[in-house]
UniProtKB/Swiss-Prot annotation:
This protein's name: Ribosomal RNA large subunit methyltransferase H
InterPro entries: Alpha/beta_knot_MTases, RlmH-like, tRNA_m1G_MTases_N
Origin species: Coxiella burnetii (strain Dugway 5J108-111)
Main location group: cytoplasm
Reactions accelerated catalytically: pseudouridine(1915) in 23S rRNA + S-adenosyl-L-methionine = N(3)-methylpseudouridine(1915) in 23S rRNA + S-adenosyl-L-homocysteine + H(+)
Gene: rlmH
Length: 155
């Protein structure tokens, strides 16, 4: 199963990259977790933030591999516990599906981007920094894998 995290932002603190990679490296090859980054548009005083959000959303969609199903992360999406996430991942794995998890920038994702999603997932009702969401997603995928395989990480 190929899992792509497609996210806005390339210039992030080293601990974000290290946190994501730490969980990605723990997963076996049949749970291939990759990060695809797109550059964030410049946000200056007076910038049209809606236009930036639309442009970034389109770049995210364009970066999704053709065979991959789109899952978007949005605070208004469905909140699930980790065992439910594990069930979803197990089902997609059984169906031999590749998925791409889209994480928008500070302004979020466009309605067009959300409409293309197979599922809209909320990590929390809280608003999280988009960079931190990458690490949380990677950890939750690793934890879900540990449930699927009865690995002791999830107790």
């Amino acid at each position: 199963m190929k899992i792509n995290v497609v996210a806005v932002g390339k210039r992030l603190p080293a601990w974000i990259k290290a946190g994501f990679q730490s969980y990605a490296d723990r997963l076996p090859r049949d749970f291939d977790l990759n990060l695809i980054e797109i550059a964030a548009f410049k946000r200056s005083k007076g910038a049209d933030l809606k236009k930036i959000m639309l442009q970034e959303s389109q770049q995210l969609i364009d970066a999704v591999p053709k065979e991959s199903e789109i899952i978007v992360l949005d605070r208004l999406g469905e909140e699930v516990d980790t065992p439910t996430l594990a069930q979803k991942l197990s089902q997609w794995r059984h169906e031999n599906r590749s998925i791409s998890l889209l994480i928008g920038g500070p302004e979020g994702l466009s309605a067009t981007c959300i409409d293309k999603a197979r599922w809209v997932w909320s990590l929390s009702a809280l608003t999280l920094p988009h960079a931190l969401a990458r690490v949380i997603v990677a950890e939750q995928i690793y934890r879900a894998w540990s449930i699927i395989t009865n690995h002791p990480y999830h107790r």
